[in-house]
């Protein structure tokens, strides 16, 4: 089948048909995802393997996190009681993470279709920000402490944990942010060493003996 016929079939079949195109296809079909109110704006931040999109859109009194799907369009995920929320990443299970204003601060959240928006709390400081999530709904991000910002990992079973504290021998590194997590639990993070240098770091989980 030629690229031209692929393109024609894609246009005729709509967005879902286009998603089945091979990666080397040379044509694209543009789809306007809209906004939460007609005269507003929308900003995407994350994309799943199923082409579900997360981000935020102005909703009248502030920006609200959204999830967009080909089947359901754009859905407002609400807030944590403050004026704003921002969707930042989406996992393979459809869980969305980001952060939202809450009681004068900003807190990391996770949203699921079953549980809605959940405040992940902090590590004793004012703010926290979720930046990545995997299919098991393990969340990574950054949270304030009394001594500065640190990277965290969160799970429903264990809550929010300081990533540096989970490394038996960090070798002088302090994890300042968890930025992504894959299905094997491997975390990509940003850290600072005792000389003040900031590096990209990879954290590989070790099974308990």
What are these regions (language model features)?
Residues 1-11:
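Bacterial N-terminal signal peptides that target proteins for export
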Residues 4, 21-209:
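Residue-level hotspots at or immediately adjacent to binding/recognition sites across diverse folds
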Residues 9-20:
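Bacterial N-terminal signal peptides
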């Amino acid at each position: 089948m030629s690229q031209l016929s692929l393109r024609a079939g894609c246009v005729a079949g709509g967005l879902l048909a286009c998603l089945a195109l091979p990666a080397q296809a040379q044509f694209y079909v543009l789809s306007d995802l809209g906004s939460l109110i007609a005269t507003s704006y929308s900003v995407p931040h994350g994309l799943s393997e199923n082409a579900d999109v997360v981000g935020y859109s102005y909703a009248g009194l502030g920006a609200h996190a959204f999830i967009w799907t080909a089947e359901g369009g754009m859905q407002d995920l609400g807030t944590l009681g403050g004026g704003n929320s921002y969707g930042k990443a989406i996992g393979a299970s459809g869980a969305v993470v980001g952060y939202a204003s809450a009681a004068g601060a900003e807190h990391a959240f996770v949203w699921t279709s079953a549980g809605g928006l959940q405040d992940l709390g902090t590590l004793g400081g004012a703010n926290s920000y979720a930046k990545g999530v995997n299919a098991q709904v393990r969340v990574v991000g950054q949270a304030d402490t009394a001594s500065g910002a640190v990277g965290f990992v969160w799970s429903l079973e264990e809550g929010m944990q300081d990533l540096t504290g989970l490394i038996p021998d960090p070798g002088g590194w302090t994890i300042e942010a968890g930025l992504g997590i894959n299905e094997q639990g491997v975390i990509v993070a940003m850290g600072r060493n005792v000389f003040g240098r900031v590096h990209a770091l990879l954290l590989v989980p070790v099974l308990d003996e």
